Each structure stands twice: as C-alpha cells, then as structure tokens.
Amino acid sequence: MIRINQRKRNIEHTSDDFERKILKTLCIKKEELQGFQIRKQSIDARKKPVLYYVYSVDVQVRDEAKVKKTVKNNQIQFQIKPDSYHFEVKGTKELTHRPVIIGTGPAGLFCGYMLAAHGYQPILLERGADVDQRTKDVEAFWENGRLNLSSNVQFGEGGAGTFSDGKLNTLVKDKFGRNHEVLRIFAEHGAPESITYESKPHIGTDVLSAVVKEMRKYICAHGGEVRFHSQVTDIQTHSDNGQKILRKLKIYDSQKKETYLLDTDLAVFAIGHSARDTFSMLYQHGLPMQPKAFAVGVRIEHPQEMINQDQYGKNYPSFLPAAPYKLTANLDNGRGVYTFCMCPGGYVVNASSEEHRLAVNGMSYSRRDSQNANTAVIVTVSPDDFESDHPLAGVEFQRKLEEAAYLEGNGKVPVQLFGDFCENRPSVQLGRVTPHIKGMYQLANVRNIFPEFIAESLTEGIQIFDHKLPGYARCDAVISGVESRTSSPVRLIRDQSLQSEIRGIYPCGEGAGYAGGITSAAMDGIKTAEMIASVYHPFKMES
C-alpha cells in the first residue's frame, strides 16, 4: 500500500477532484487505481481566508513496484502495512470467579468489551443508571435542580465523557494500535466513519450515548453482564505471606436498597475522576496513592461566529464546521494557563455530583450548532498548593472551590461578565453574549470562588489569549464556575503488572490517574484487559 502525505486540496474540492489528484501524483491511469482511503484530514487556515483541507491518503494500486520506480517524492511512502491491532490471549492461570470491572466510563467499558470479546465473561458494576435513564435524570436536574447522587453528569453508563463534547483525539504515544482500535470500535457501533481519520475527531453527547448502549449490548451478547445501580462500597482481602489479596467486593444496590458480597479474583477499578468516596475507601484499606497536579478555573463563552471568523476568515464557507481553538500561556508567576475541552457550538453544563457543591463542564451535540463556543480556561495547581500532604488533599481543594461556587450562585451556576471579573464586582446584567447553559444560572461574582493567585492567573491568561484570538477578552464574554473536574486529583499506584499492592486490584483509566480524556482512558482499559489476558485463561463457567 502507498501512503501520500500532506496533500492540500481546495476547501471546496469534490471526490472526483480528489481521485484525479491521486492519479496525477502517482502518475497512473484510472484503471491502475484499485482503491484509496483517507488516513488523516485536517483544515489548514494559516493563510486565511484561503483555506485548504490537508490529507494523508492510503492508496492501493495494481503495480506498486512500478509506481515506486516512476515517482520520486519524499511525501510518498511505499509498502505501508494497514493498521492492525491484535489482542493476544496467552494466560494460563485459571479464574475461580468472573473478572469484575467497576465503572462503565471509557476505561471500564473498553476493558469489559475486550474481555467479553475473548471469553472472559466479565461483570461490569456501575453505580449509576443506564444511559437512557441517566439522560432523563440529568435533564431533570438541569430543569429543577434536584440532584441524583448516583445518576448525574459524572456517574452512570458511559462515564463523565457521555455529557461532554465527545472529543476522541489524544496525545498519547501509541505503537500498539490501541488508538485506532478505539476509533474502529466506536465506528463499528454507530459513530461516523470520519472519526477514524479526522485530525480532531468528535461525536457529540447524542451520538456517544447511542454508541455506549450498543457496546453494552455487545458485551452482554458475548457473555458479559452489566449491573447498574451497583456501587462498590467496600472490599475484603485476605493475607498470603503478608501480601494483601482481594477476595470480595461489597456492593450496594441502590434500586433494591440492599447490600451483597461478590467473590472475585480480580477487579478493575475504572472509577472515574469523581469517585471521591471510593478513593477514600481504598485509602482506608491502605491502597497506595499519591496526590497529583491538575488544573482548575472557569468556563468562558463567546459567540461561535466570532471564533469562526477569527479562525477561518470573515467570508468563510458556510459548510465548514464550527471552529475549535486551543490556547496556552505561561505566566510570570510560573503557572500555566490553558484552554481545555473546548466545545464549538456547545453548552456549559451543571456537572455537579455532590450535595451543596457545584461544578461545571462543557458539552456539545454532534451538530455543534449552538450560537456559543465555550471552553474551560484553567490554571495549573500542584500538591504544593494543597493544605496538607495527604494523598486526598487535592480532593479537598476541589471541594472547597465547589462549595464556594454553590454558595456564590445560591445553588445555581454562578455567571459573570469577564469585564466584571477583572474588576472584582458582581455582574448585574448581561451584554451581547447570552449564556448557553444546561441548568439554572445566576449572575454573581465568580471571582469570589477562587484564591487570588488563581483569579489573577485567569485574568492575565485570558488577556494574553486576546492577542491570539481578537475579541477573546471582550468585556461581555460570559464566565461561569467552577471548572474543577479537569482530571483526577489522585493517582492510585500500580506496578508493571498494572496491579496495586493489594493484589487483584487493577487501577485503571482517568480516575486512577493514568489517562486524560475519552480515548486515552479507553486505551488504558484495553491495556488492562491485555494484561489480564496475559495472566489468566478465559473464564469457564462450572456446569
């Protein structure tokens, strides 16, 4: 197979134009072309308003050797092997009990998917509801403010990413093919095929919800089981020559209002970044963990049209997608300020999961067609900023900010104009930017939520961003808070076997501190499944 890299095409090109360009580049006739597939696609707007698509394309031809002799171009590679991923089952150790996966976010879901596909018959435990009921619970919360502690934006089938922009890009280095396998599985279960080649793939909360459901059906059809409303509240261990080994899980069924014990040889803790009670429980059992740096800040909203013109030029074609952006700044105080989880044509959402605490996030539907662009603007914080060196001190740091946000908005999302934020005064009216928020909101002084070093860093960072995207620091840009769940505040220590010191416990995904975002969490879930399959033979149910 031949790969053509860095091929620029006019933004309005047709598929026929595309094929003609391939034929010309490879100096072949149409009958010599057997097929082609887009490998990567991105938009080049560096010379706006002149815009291009930039492609990498994999091409099959009748006689590759002939083309190789004829064409001399350093952007063309020959004898490319197709992407392939291989899940190897080589474990010999017998499982006494079915493997258990705690959490059905991307890490848990993909771990369960791979184990089910290869005969391990996993049990997936999810404290929240299935995605259909969860959606109803979340929409009810946004409408009336009554929070369901186990079925909300953070907890339930699909994890926190279900109510997000559904971004699928990752910066994780991947020589094993896990990244492409994640995208392939998503596409196989209902996501658009374009996610496999777009430079910044996303599917939106509406499509992601449907894909998650189809993946669950696959798991169940291949011998797996998914138990909703099932929260792990405790573990039981036994000792073997001084080594703690997992023996049982204590599970609370919130629908039946009853507790039961589940025997298991191993449990994958893919619990997500908001499972603070589970972090605490594991700490009480002596599972090694450490605080880690993360970032906190606000959501900021601008008109999407302003962002489109900044990115594409004033007279951009209407068929282009809502434009994204990514901005960073290093401040004189040594801290970094950057945008995170930018949602073109999206919504700010009340993403709370604890009583009397309030957190926000960003979300987009697949069409990305709201009038506003929003992003988190966040400031790095490290364990040095926490009040103690306790492993869970970062959790308490988050909680204090969320409590302040709840009080500032009287239980609603506190909202402020950026100009008022700079002047440290509460907003009393909106400007030309109307908030697009899922959930009730109230004008307030968002600056009151933060320590001064965070507030000053946010102000300085946003003003720097204005030099990169004109209008970014406009006085009527709408900010809301608090963006506190950007990543896990703790890392659950695991060794090369991916287990903790309590053998049989596999910390996994974003909550455990080993991923950041949907795709990297899914990849870590696959990696954990691979490790289990390298030790254990597929589960055999006793007849």
Please place each PLM-identified region on the residue numbering.
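Residues forming the flavin
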Residues: 1-53, 57-163, 167-543
